[in-house]
Amino acid sequence: MLLTVALVGCQSEETQSNTGLTAQAKADAVVAQKRQLAESFSQNYAAYAHTLKTQISADNLSISVSELVESAPNTEMSQQLRSADKNVRTLKGIDQFTEQLLQLRLADASMLKEWQEGQSPLFAFEPSGNDDSWQYIEAYDVYGQIHQLDVYQLPDVPVFVVDNDSAVELKAGLQAMRAEMQRLGQSPQLSTQESSSIEASTRSLSRSASADTAPISTTVLKKIRLQDDKEPWISGRAEIYALVTGVDPSRDKPTIDLIDMPYLDYDKQDYFPNQVVIHWTRYRWGAADMILMEQDDGTDYKELAKQLVKVAEEVLKLIPDPEVQGYAIIAQITGKIIEAIPDGVLVNDDDFVDVFYTLMQDTQYTDHPGANGNATATFEPLTIYPTK
């Protein structure tokens, strides 16, 4: 499962790739690729059964397509796997940032014993569109027959899911978004934004700091908890990231930073990441908002980056003198991002998790609820001395 925002709008030139496909059409093409692979795996299960049983375990419920190709590199099925993986990466705009993406994943650890004891599995894929509209999950048995599974009730038979490796996808997706945002004029994101801990942030800053580098003001995410993660069983673990939004201190341009949260997998569980999430030299008025997102399987990351920048810049263009309104502008930017990104960019519109409005520099927030009440977090100010 992966976090993102629900967005409304019409299809336009901005939601089309260089190939002319709309984002919805690209998402449908991704699903079609996975459907074909699920059917092919069902028909070729005997050829891969040994490899799967030696690689799949309680500690590792998935195997990458590249590993399956290595087990039989010269077969027609391996050629299909290579081609599908390349196509999906291209459709999602991340081909330049990862060499492999697809995997075969056992849907739940509870299925492992029965499968290892000889129960034939089904092979499924995630449908297209918003999961609220899904009527069933399609899965193929080893005879090529289609079964219709309940969307939310975990099946009582082993099911392998043809899926994206969500961690690989999110990492590559954020890289693609950062590159596209920088191309569109956003100032480069500082290294602390990409670090998972205070220690890593400090080491990264120290490597490039001179002896007279000034202390750096940041805000650290000390604790976070999600209340409800209503995802179908086929979607697997959540992959959460955040958008930190604000205004550039030196020009009338928005600042949008992307924060990876690879640890935040499940709801109703406390996490203590000690992660630097805001670097205050990038934000005017010492104020910023933070939107929590769930990665969407249908996301085209380059198009999403374009839309984020476009929407934020349009808000600022409507305000002649930002200093008059001050940091109240930030909530307008955040609100437009949540409301205005077209449904064609994020085809599964259940992805907005929560938002923290008006986080202030040098301010501590303890068990601070998000505006939707779905997330609770503790933030603390931290001054980093890079040369120490």
What are these model-derived regions, one by one?
Residues 261-291, 327, 331-334, 338-341:
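Polybasic, proline/glycine-rich intrinsically disordered low-complexity segments
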Residues 242, 272-314:
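Eukaryotic beta-sheet cores, primarily in C2 and C2-like/PH beta-sandwich modules
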Residues 5-9:
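C-terminal motif of bacterial Sec signal peptides marking the signal peptidase cleavage site
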Residues 314-388:
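A eukaryote-biased signal for long
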